[in-house]
């Protein structure tokens, strides 16, 4: 497991995360954009790929998410993360800025918080 992966995410949770991402209204993609969104407090949920190399690219993101109280989770690969938001290329990190279905996001965040406990 990568250094920055703080908890294990079941497959069905990854699928639910991808579904919520695909229905999001506005997202920021890439480690730099996600870092800025977290620091500004505009991110509602951060999703990181588990296969980022070198790991240092995203290793700081879970730490600043915890400092800012922003929930975060993981998806297996950068390719899966890119596909979930409609990109033809892979991405290491995504932050949801605006969502269409607030209830689905809230439900997902509660499940993520349950994994950390």
From Swiss-Prot:
One of its GO terms (cellular component) is ribonucleoprotein complex. It is found in: Cytoplasm. The keyword Protein biosynthesis does not apply. Keywords: Cytoplasm, Ribonucleoprotein, Ribosomal protein, RNA-binding, rRNA-binding, tRNA processing. One of its GO terms (molecular function) is ribonuclease P activity. GO terms for biological process: translation; tRNA 5'-leader removal. The keyword Ribosomal protein applies. It comes from the Archaea. InterPro entries: eL8/uL1-like, Ribosomal_eL30-like_sf, Ribosomal_eL8/eL30/eS12/Gad45, Ribosomal_eL8/Nhp2, Ribosomal_eL8_arc. PANTHER family: RIBOSOMAL PROTEIN L7AE FAMILY MEMBER. Belongs to the eukaryotic ribosomal protein eL8 family. Part of the 50S ribosomal subunit. Probably part of the RNase P complex. Multifunctional RNA-binding protein that recognizes the K-turn motif in ribosomal RNA, the RNA component of RNase P, box H/ACA, box C/D and box C'/D' sRNAs. This is Large ribosomal subunit protein eL8. It comes from Methanococcus aeolicus (strain ATCC BAA-1280 / DSM 17508 / OCM 812 / Nankai-3). The gene is rpl7ae.
